[in-house]
Design a protein with these regions (language model features):
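N-terminal membrane-anchoring/stem segments of glycan-assembly enzymes
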Residues: 1-50, 340
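Short, well-formed alpha-helical segments that are part of the catalytic scaffolds
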Residues: 40-43, 65-78
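Cell-envelope/extracellular polymer assembly enzymes that use nucleotide-activated donors
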Residues: 54-57, 85
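Acidic donor-binding segment of Leloir-type glycosyltransferases
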Residues: 73-120
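Long helical/loop segments within the catalytic core of UDP-sugar-dependent glycosyltransferases
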Residues: 108-125, 129, 133, 159-230, ...
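Short beta-strand-to-loop acidic/aromatic patch adjacent to the donor-nucleotide binding site
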Residues: 139-150
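Catalytic donor/gating beta->alpha subdomain of glycosyltransferases that bind UDP-sugars
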Residues: 164, 170-195, 221-224, 228-293
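Membrane-embedded multi-pass helical conduit in multi-pass membrane proteins
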Residues: 300-385
Length: 390
């Protein structure tokens, strides 16, 4: 019967789709699922945590962000932690921010603030702000976050600190967005989650390659042993991802994914802000050491090939009225969609993300690599001086 017939081209397309589906399954089940596996282990008490709570310094770099400081700084200062200090390095206008920080210092004895000199040269202002904060820190353990970030709970520091074992020098945490309603926010929230599934997944697999400075801890001694940001001092960016890429190893890095240890950012208001952030990370990603970005690039490549293969299979088979072949091709798409939706949404639940991704998932699945290509093209055609220190 014609409906159950196969021709050679359709057989090749079905086989190619099946191989690409297997490749995708390996990525999702062996890499992207690791946050969920870690959460299950933590729930069963199968992970070893330190019982000590060493003193630590929280460092926040703010750039003309008095409203963000008003909104988020009290939640950081009121963490349930025995001994910690908060150091705010203010870059930009000093009037309102300076007044607010001085006012808070009268209420919180563990709050200190300083500023980036207007005359600073030869280093990016963000890296200088981080360096000033680290130099001012009294304690060895440093926790990095940003003024637009708010901890989900007062246990944030305790949960990070339970990973401060004798061998640990770097702890990677998760940062996401507060729930917003716009299309921009849905895209950014998915991108933030999927990016975390990649870099935290690799770290949990023993191959850390980057971190994000909104929820990141490392030792002050490690920073100075590595001579700070000297390896990429000429770049504006890299104070978080390039530094982690430089210092993080299998035996000195841990990951904290408890939902109470998550920090949240305000919903994005302008596409421009998100674009500039993504372009900034794209400009430094090409400098990462290790094979991780190539491995992830192959996942993206195999993903796009998979979609091309199953669509070609269904269309060609339908044109020939080979409905069995068309059904098999579509079933391979359905299988991957179900697997992908389960892994992504279970991970979102583990991280207390408010969004669940179902109907929009196929759109984001295609849109995400196209967006990444767009950021890379921006980097390619922009004036290279834009990425150098200012």
């Amino acid at each position: 019967m014609e409906a159950f017939a196969f021709d050679t081209t359709e057989q090749y397309l079905l086989a190619a789709t099946g191989i690409l589906l297997a490749v995708q399954a390996i990525y999702y089940l062996a890499l992207y699922n690791r946050i969920h596996l870690r959460s299950r282990k933590a729930g069963r008490d199968d992970l070893h945590f330190s019982q000590e709570l060493p003193p630590l310094s929280v460092i926040i770099c703010a750039h003309e962000e008095v409203e963000n400081l008003r909104r988020n700084l009290p939640a950081i200062l009121e963490q349930d932690y025995p001994q910690f200090e908060v150091i705010v390095i203010n870059d930009g206008e000093k009037g309102e921010s300076e007044d607010y920080l001085t006012q808070l210092e009268n209420r919180y004895s563990n709050l200190y603030h300083s500023f980036v000199p207007d005359s600073s040269r030869y280093i990016s202002r963000k890296k200088l702000a981080v360096t000033l904060g680290i130099r001012a820190a009294r304690y060895d353990w440093l926790v990095m976050t940003e003024a637009n970030c708010c901890p989900q709970s007062n246990q944030w520091l305790r949960l990070l600190a339970r990973n401060f074992t004798s061998r640990t020098e770097v702890v990677l945490g998760y940062s996401g967005y507060e729930r917003g309603r716009s299309w921009l926010h849905r895209r950014a929230a998915f991108d933030s989650l999927f990016t975390a599934m990649r870099y935290l997944g690799f770290a949990l697999a023993g191959s850390p390659y980057m971190g994000i400075g909104r929820n990141l801890a490392y030792r002050k001694s490690l920073f100075f042993d590595q001579k700070g940001f000297s390896a990429h001092l000429n770049l504006r960016r890299g104070d978080d991802d390039l530094f982690v890429n430089q210092v993080a190893r299998r035996d000195n890095t841990r990951v904290e994914t408890d939902p109470a240890a998550v920090v949240r950012m305000q919903p994005l208001l302008r596409t421009k802000d998100w674009r500039e952030e993504k372009i900034g990370y794209a400009s430094t990603a090409r400098l990462y050491h290790g094979a991780q970005r190539w491995i992830l690039g192959f996942e993206t490549f195999s993903r796009l090939l998979f979609h091309a293969a199953w669509i070609a299979t269904v269309v060609l088979a339908a044109l020939h009225t080979h409905w069995l072949v068309a059904a098999l091709g579509f079933l391979q798409f359905v299988f991957r969609f179900v697997m992908q939706a389960l892994v992504i949404n279970i991970t979102a639940k583990d991280l207390d993300e408010k969004y669940r991704h179902y109907l929009l998932l196929p759109i984001f699945d295609i849109l995400q690599p196209l967006q990444s290509l767009r950021w890379k093209l921006y980097c390619l055609f922009r004036d290279k001086r834009e990425f150098l220190r200012k």
